[in-house]
Regions:
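Anion-binding catalytic surfaces of enzymes that hydrolyze or transfer phosphate/sulfate esters
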Residues: 1-37, 41
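Loop/turn elements at helix/coil->beta-strand transitions in domains of secreted/extracellular proteins
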Residues: 9-13, 49-55, 101-102
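Beta-strand elements within well-structured catalytic alpha/beta cores of enzymes
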Residues: 12-18, 37, 54-62, 130
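Substrate-binding rim/cap in mid-to-C-terminal beta-strand-loop elements of soluble/periplasmic
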Residues: 16-24, 76-133
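Active-site rim elements
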Residues: 22-31, 41, 89-94, 110-121, ...
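Extracytoplasmic/secreted proteins, especially bacterial periplasmic and envelope-associated proteins
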Residues: 32-39, 43, 61-64, 101, ...
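Metal-dependent active-site segment of extracytoplasmic phospho-/sulfohydrolases and closely related
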Residues: 39-82
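Conserved small/polar residues in nucleotide/adenosyl-binding loops
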Residues: 183-189
Length: 190
């Protein structure tokens, strides 16, 4: 991503999966993940792509059972949302999602609200957003992996944005010291 960004060859959609040392998983620290997020966001905001880019930083998992908010469930038996427990058939049908809340944030010229997004979303929401974005650019497609219940009940993230106002100023992000667990990493800068 960083090399494509610097060389002006960034594709229309990119996924960044960090090395384990920058994942915030133990034994690594939140600072390690914050460093790479800050580096990517700052590099993007200073690049030629800033005026037409949306960066969604989506964690891959939750805080688990510590979350005080119950996850939404589809009605029992909803196709694609319930399955028989593979380890204990006596338990019968069990929900498979959407699961506990997962943190994410969006950085773009169209997201300056500084608020908290409260719609029900899941990892599927990023796919729903990409479908909407693609359709707006004349490239209609639909992910067949999403069932009708998720399409109806999960956010497509469109309300995160105000596309009538584009603020090209570069927000100042907090300083994050370099990840100590990954000091051998050399990334290009703008």
């Amino acid at each position: 991503f960083m090399f494509d960004l610097k060389n002006g060859s960034l594709p229309q959609v990119s996924y960044i999966i960090t090395p384990i040392e920058l994942s915030e998983h133990p034994p690594y620290t939140p600072n390690d993940g914050a460093w790479i997020q800050s580096h990517v966001a700052n590099s993007l905001m200073k690049s030629q792509y800033w005026n037409r880019t949306v960066m969604i930083m989506n964690y891959d998992e939750t805080g688990g059972f510590a979350d005080h908010v119950m996850s939404p469930l589809s009605p029992k038996g909803t196709d694609g949302e319930w399955m028989e427990d593979p380890f204990d058939h006596k338990l019968g049908q069990q929900p498979v999602g959407p699961g506990y809340r997962v943190p994410f944030y969006v950085v773009s010229p169209w997201t300056r609200k500084g608020g908290v997004f409260t719609e029900i979303a899941s990892h599927d929401s990023c796919i729903l957003f990409l479908e909407k974005w693609s359709a707006a650019h004349g490239k209609n497609w639909t992910s067949k992996e999403l069932n009708p219940w998720r399409r109806k009940h999960m956010s497509d993230l469109m309300s995160v944005f105000d596309f009538s106002k584009r603020d090209m100023s570069v927000p100042r992000l907090p300083h994050v010291s370099k990840a100590v667990s990954y000091t051998h990493l050399t990334l290009p800068t703008n």
